[in-house]
From Swiss-Prot:
Molecular-function GO terms, alphabetical: heme binding; iron ion binding; oxidoreductase activity; oxidoreductase activity, acting on paired donors, with incorporation or reduction of molecular oxygen, reduced flavin or flavoprotein as one donor, and incorporation of one atom of oxygen; polyketide synthase activity
Membrane topology per record: Single-pass membrane protein
Pathway: Mycotoxin biosynthesis
PROSITE patterns named among the record's database cross-references: CYTOCHROME_P450
InterPro entries, A to Z: Cyt_P450 (IPR001128), Cyt_P450_CS (IPR017972), Cyt_P450_E_CYP52_ascomycetes (IPR002974), Cyt_P450_E_CYP52_fungi (IPR047146), Cyt_P450_sf (IPR036396)
Protein name, entry field: Cytochrome P450 monooxygenase iliC
Organism: Neonectria sp. (strain DH2)
Transmembrane segments: 6-26
EC number from the UniProt entry: 1.-.-.-
Function per UniProt: Cytochrome P450 monooxygenase; part of the gene cluster that mediates the biosynthesis of ilicicolin H, a 4-hydroxy-2-pyridonealkaloid that has potent and broad antifungal activities by inhibiting the mitochondrial respiration chain. IliC catalyzes the ring expansion of the tetramate intermediate to the acyclic 2-pyridone intermediate that contains the trans bis-diene chain. The biosynthesis of ilicicolin H starts with formation of the tetramic acid by the hybrid PKS-NRPS synthetase iliA with the partnering trans-enoyl reductase iliB since iliA lacks a designated enoylreductase (ER) domain.
Catalytic function, reaction form: (3E,5S)-3-[(2E,4E,8S,10E,12Z)-1-hydroxy-4,8-dimethyltetradeca-2,4,10,12-tetraen-1-ylidene]-5-[(4-hydroxyphenyl)methyl]pyrrolidine-2,4-dione + reduced [NADPH--hemoprotein reductase] + O2 = 3-[(2E,4E,8S,10E,12Z)-4,8-dimethyltetradeca-2,4,10,12-tetraenoyl]-4-hydroxy-5-(4-hydroxyphenyl)-1,2-dihydropyridin-2-one + oxidized [NADPH--hemoprotein reductase] + 2 H2O
UniProt xrefs under CDD domains: CYP52
GO biological process, one term: ilicicolin H biosynthetic process
Primary site of residence: membrane
Length: 505
C-alpha cells in the first residue's frame, strides 16, 4: 500500500537526486567555461528566442521554411542583425552559426579531429534504413576506409577524361528542341547525367536519354534526399513524422542498386574461378562498383557505401549545371562572353586542359557556386572540447570555446554573399569578380581539409564540358520563366520550376 509517508520519502529522494544532477551539470559547465577563459576565449552572442529552454521557435520556423521552399531566405534572415558568429538553442542543444572563413578552416582542417558527423548522422539512425556506414556518415578509421573505396574518383585518367563525357553529351544535344521552343533544360541535364554517372559507377549507362521512363528512379532519389535532410535536422522528433513515403523511395533505390551489386559479385566470382582454373579472363572493369566490390565482400555494407555516393552525387552535379544555365539565361552578356571564349578555341577537342584554360568559363562556374551553392551549410558536431578562432567577445573577433556535443554550422550561403568579402554587388551574378582573384577559405564550394569532396575535379570538368558544348552551338539562351529563383532543398537547392528556357542557333 502506498502511504503519504512513502510518497513524501520518494519525493524527497527525487528532489535530492535532481538537485545533485543539477549541481553536477552546472559545475561541469562552469569548469568548461573556466577552461575556455583560461585559453583566452570569450562568449559568443546569443540570438533572442521566445523559447530559450528547448528552442522550439527555431525548430518550427525551420520546418516551415523547408516545407514552404523559403529555407535560404530564412537562413539569411536568421543571420541578419547578428554578428557573424552567434549561438541558438535548437532542441535544447547549443548550436553555433558562423560565416567566418577562419572558423571553417579551423573546423575542417586545423582542428579536424575535434569535429565530426557520425554522432548526428549515423548514431541517430536518421539515415537508416537507407544507409549505415559510408563516406558521409562516419568518422575516423571507418571514414578513411570509405574514402579508400572511392579511389577511382582520384584517378587523373578518370577526372581529366572528356572522351567518357562526349557520347552522352552528343546524345543530349540531339534532343534539345529547335529554335525558340520552350523546354525544361534541367530534366534533360538530369537524364544526361544519369547516363554519365551510371556508366562510371556501374559500368553501363541507364540509357535515360533514350528511355525517359528509366529516369523515374530520379524521383525516388529526390525523395530519399529530402527525407534524409529532414531526418538529419530533426532527428530528435523523427517519431512525429509519417515516413511511409520515404521508406518506399528507399526500397526503390535499394532495388535498383541491388541488381548491380549482385551482377558484379557474380562476375567477380566467375573471374576468380577462371583464374583458378588457368583459363583466360577479360581485362578488369574500371567502374567504381567493381573496385568497391573487390575490396568489400559484403552485399549490405557495399550497398550502404554505394547509396551514399550514387544518390547525392547524381543530384548535386545535375543541379549545379542546371543552376549555371539558369543564371546564364538571365545574363545574355555573360553568355556572349563565354561563347566568344569557347569559339576562340575553334574545333579543337575540348580537353581537360583546354577547359581549365578557359578563364571566363571557370569564372562562370565559380560565380554559380557562390550564388547558388550546393553545400548551403557545412555542419559538424564537436567531438572534443575545442576552440574556434573568431566570434567571441563584444567585437565578435575573439576565440570562443566549443563544448563537446555542440553543433557548429558554417553558413556558406551567407559567407558567399558577405559584402565585406565580395563587395557591395555581392547579390549580383558577376563572373568577372573571379578574374585574377585568389580565393582561400572564404570560397570552398567543395569543402576543405581532409573531408573535401573527392569528386571536385570530376564535377568541374563535366560542368565545363557541357557549357562549352552548348556555347559552340547556341548563340543565345533565353529565360522563359520570369520568376525569381525559389530554392527547393534536396541535397542542395534546386529551382522549384527547373530551368525553363529557349535556345537559338
Amino acid at each position: 500500500m502506498i502511504t503519504n509517508d512513502l510518497i513524501a520519502q520518494h519525493s524527497l529522494t527525487l528532489t535530492i537526486a535532481s538537485s545533485v544532477l543539477l549541481v553536477f551539470l552546472l559545475s561541469r559547465l562552469l569548469r568548461k567555461d573556466a577552461t575556455g577563459k583560461a585559453q583566452g576565449c570569450r562568449p559568443v552572442a546569443k540570438r533572442w528566442q521566445w523559447d530559450p529552454i528547448l528552442g522550439l521557435d527555431i525548430v518550427l520556423a525551420q520546418i516551415g521554411a523547408l516545407k514552404g521552399n523559403y529555407y535560404l531566405p530564412w537562413l539569411i534572415e536568421l543571420h541578419s542583425n547578428m554578428p557573424k558568429t552567434f549561438e541558438i538553442n535548437f532542441f535544447g542543444k547549443r548550436q553555433i552559426y558562423t560565416s567566418e572563413p577562419d572558423n571553417l578552416k579551423a573546423m575542417t582542417a586545423t582542428n579536424f579531429h575535434d569535429f565530426g558527423i557520425e554522432p548526428m548522422r549515423r548514431h541517430t539512425k536518421g539515415s537508416m534504413p537507407f544507409a549505415d556506414k559510408g563516406i558521409s556518415t562516419v568518422d575516423g578509421k571507418e571514414w578513411e576506409f570509405s574514402r579508400f573505396l572511392l579511389k577511382p574518383f582520384f584517378y587523373r585518367e578518370v577526372y581529366t577524361s572528356t572522351d567518357r563525357i562526349e557520347p552522352f553529351a552528343d546524345h543530349m544535344m540531339a534532343l534539345i528542341p529547335g529554335d525558340g521552343e520552350s523546354f525544361n533544360m534541367q530534366s534533360l541535364i538530369q537524364r544526361w547525367f544519369l547516363d554519365l554517372t551510371t556508366n562510371f559507377i556501374f559500368g553501363k549507362p541507364m540509357d535515360a536519354l533514350e528511355n525517359p521512363d528509366r529516369a523515374r528512379i530520379t524521383w525516388a532519389m529526390l525523395d530519399v534526399l529530402k527525407g534524409g535532410r529532414l531526418r538529419a535536422q530533426f532527428y530528435m522528433m523523427m517519431w512525429a513524422f509519417n515516413w511511409t513515403w520515404w521508406y518506399k523511395a528507399v526500397a526503390e533505390v535499394h532495388d535498383f542498386i541491388n541488381v548491380h551489386i549482385r551482377e558484379t559479385y557474380k562476375e567477380i566470382e566467375e573471374r576468380e574461378q577462371r583464374i583458378k582454373d588457368g583459363k583466360p579472363v577479360e581485362p578488369e572493369r574500371t567502374d567504381l562498383i567493381w573496385y568497391m566490390a573487390w575490396n568489400l565482400r559484403d552485399e549490405e555494407l557495399l550497398r550502404s557505401q554505394l547509396c551514399l555516393v550514387f544518390v547525392p552525387n547524381n543530384d548535386t552535379t545535375s543541379i549545379f549545371i542546371s543552376n549555371c544555365i539558369w543564371h546564364l539565361a538571365r545574363h545574355p552578356e555573360a553568355w556572349e562572353k563565354l561563347r566568344q571564349e569557347v569559339l576562340a578555341h575553334g574545333d579543337a577537342p575540348l580537353t581537360f586542359e583546354a577547359l581549365r584554360n578557359m578563364k571566363y568559363l571557370q569564372c562562370v562556374l565559380n560565380e554559380t557556386h557562390r550564388l547558388t551553392p550546393n553545400n548551403v551549410t557545412q555542419i559538424r558536431v564537436c567531438l572534443n572540447d575545442s576552440v574556434l578562432p573568431v566570434g567571441g567577445g563584444k567585437n565578435a573577433k575573439e576565440p570562443f570555446f566549443v563544448r563537446k556535443g555542440d553543433v557548429v554550422s558554417i553558413t556558406k550561403t551567407v559567407m558567399y554573399r558577405d559584402p565585406e568579402i565580395w563587395g557591395n554587388d555581392a547579390e549580383e551574378f558577376k563572373p568577372e569578380r573571379f578574374d585574377g582573384r585568389r580565393v582561400f577559405w572564404e570560397f570552398l564550394p567543395f569543402g576543405g581539409g581532409p573531408r573535401r569532396c573527392p569528386a571536385q575535379m570530376m564535377v568541374q570538368t563535366e560542368a565545363a564540358y557541357m557549357l562549352a558544348r552548348l556555347a559552340r552551338v547556341y548563340r543565345r539562351i533565353e529565360a522563359r520563366d520570369p520568376a525569381p529563383y525559389t530554392a527547393v532543398m534536396r541535397i542542395g537547392p534546386s529551382n522549384k520550376t527547373g530551368v525553363q528556357i529557349a535556345v537559338y542557333k
